A protein has these predicted regions:
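Catalytic Tyr-X3-Lys loop
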Residues: 8, 16, 27-51, 71, ...
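A conserved structural motif in NAD(P)-dependent oxidoreductases
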Residues: 153-164, 175
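Short C-terminal tail/terminal secondary-structure segment
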Residues: 28, 89-92, 151, 169, ...
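Conserved NAD(P)H cofactor-binding loop of Rossmann-fold oxidoreductase domains
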Residues: 13-27, 189
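Catalytic loop of short-chain dehydrogenase/reductase
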Residues: 30-36, 71-124
């Protein structure tokens, strides 16, 4: 703010995507074994962090005559539950099977609630708040995982890392000046089913 005189956009994109350690007799990604300290840390980073940034910078944006935009980066897993079948491996006992940890979806769903709250809170100051809900990005996952997840996406593939930029730039820009409180999935159609 000191360098530019004002702030007119905020992107809340901090999150943990927990990779939880296993032991010989437990898989800590599983709900019944999930450590409370990891729960607290993931909520603090992903949800409390977005709240604090929105609280501080949203007030600054609200002081601008033209307002501005807050975009919370949620996920398709904030709209739908993770398909835990994607993480299963043959020959591994149930209690040791990997799953998508609970906190990722909880944080991403919480961001949708925060988005809706903020969309109404500062609307009279022309501060818009929307959520971008990207699907998964292909980034070196095992071939069997990519094959299975692609079957669940109408476009038949995961996203490339640069395929969310256009939607994010649009949501931050004046081209979306009447978009407020929107939850925008960019997921190849995965949540359309």
């Amino acid at each position: 703010i000191e360098n530019f005189g004002k702030i007119d956009g905020l992107v809340n994109n901090a999150a943990n995507n927990p990779k939880v350690e296993e032991s010989s007799d437990k898989n800590f990604s599983r709900l019944e074994n999930f450590p409370l300290n990891i729960w607290n840390n993931d909520i603090a980073v992903g949800l409390t962090g977005a709240f604090l940034c929105s609280k501080y910078y949203g007030e600054k944006i609200a002081q601008n005559p033209d307002g501005g935009s807050i975009v919370n980066i949620s996920s398709d897993l904030g709209l739908i539950a993770p398909d835990q079948r994607l993480y299963k491996k043959d020959g591994i006992p149930e209690n040791l099977q990997n799953v998508k940890p609970v906190t990722y979806s909880v944080v991403k769903t919480g961001l949708i609630g925060l988005t809706r709250y903020l969309a109404t809170y500062w609307a009279d100051k022309n501060v818009r708040c929307n959520a971008l809900c990207p699907g998964g990005v292909e980034n070196g996952q095992p071939d069997d995982f990519l094959r299975e997840v692609s079957k669940r996406i109408p476009m038949g593939r995961m996203a490339n890392s640069d395929e969310y930029q256009g939607a994010l730039l649009w949501m931050l820009s004046n081209a979306s000046s009447y978009l407020n409180g929107a939850i925008v999935p960019v997921d190849g159609g995965r949540t359309a089913w």
